[in-house]
Amino acid sequence: FDRYNQILDEHNMNLREAEQILRYLKVKSVKDEETKKIKQEEAEMKKKIEGEASRKKLELEQRRTEQQPSGDANDMFGSTDDLMNLDLDNFRTDFLDFGETSERPQNDDMMKDIFEMKTADNSEGSAMDSLTDLNLDFLDQPAQAGPEPAAPAQEDDAGLMPTDQMENLFSQFDELVNSGDY
């Protein structure tokens, strides 16, 4: 009977050891499945992120290729959307001739020659000759010590734009600033 109990005890011990091993393997398999699942999710997220990055890179390249034909304005100003939409129809007459009287400066023709580069023999010397022929008499005149005398009011208004054009420009400027599209 003692021997029988001893064999049963050994058998019980073996069963308990086997039971512990099975529990360990069960827990290990659950953990392995969880790690596999986490790794798969990480791999999917990585693929998704890489896919989005490559898609964004392609879109950026497409934008660059689309913007290259209009590169002249973009090179100078960055983006054509940022440029102000101004009415420049009368720019020459309104702004470049601002304050101009009937007299033209005597060196105006020489300046035109310089900018047009009228060189018959394609040499750079003739353009430099025009530069040395400029009227630089103002350099020989001494500076006035006192403040300049005030000009009559009639002369100040002679070169200004008409009041309605000024008001129009100011109203366009106010609209632009208040709209927030600047």
UniProtKB/Swiss-Prot annotation:
Q: Where is the composition biased (Low complexity)?
A: 140-153
Could you confirm whether the keyword Aminoacyl-tRNA synthetase appears in this record? no
**Residue spans of biased composition, Basic and acidic residues class:** 32-66
Q: Which residues form a coiled coil?
A: 1-68
- The yes or no answer to whether the keyword Zinc is present is no
Q: Where is this region: Disordered?
A: 32-81, 140-160
**According to its UniProt record, where is this protein located?**
Cytoplasm, Cytoskeleton
**Domain of life the protein comes from:** Eukaryota
Question: May I have one GO cellular component term?
Answer: cytoskeleton
Q: Which UniProt keywords apply?
A: Coiled coil, Cytoplasm, Cytoskeleton, Repeat
Q: What is this protein called?
A: Tropomyosin-like protein
The organism of origin for this protein: Pichia angusta (Yeast)
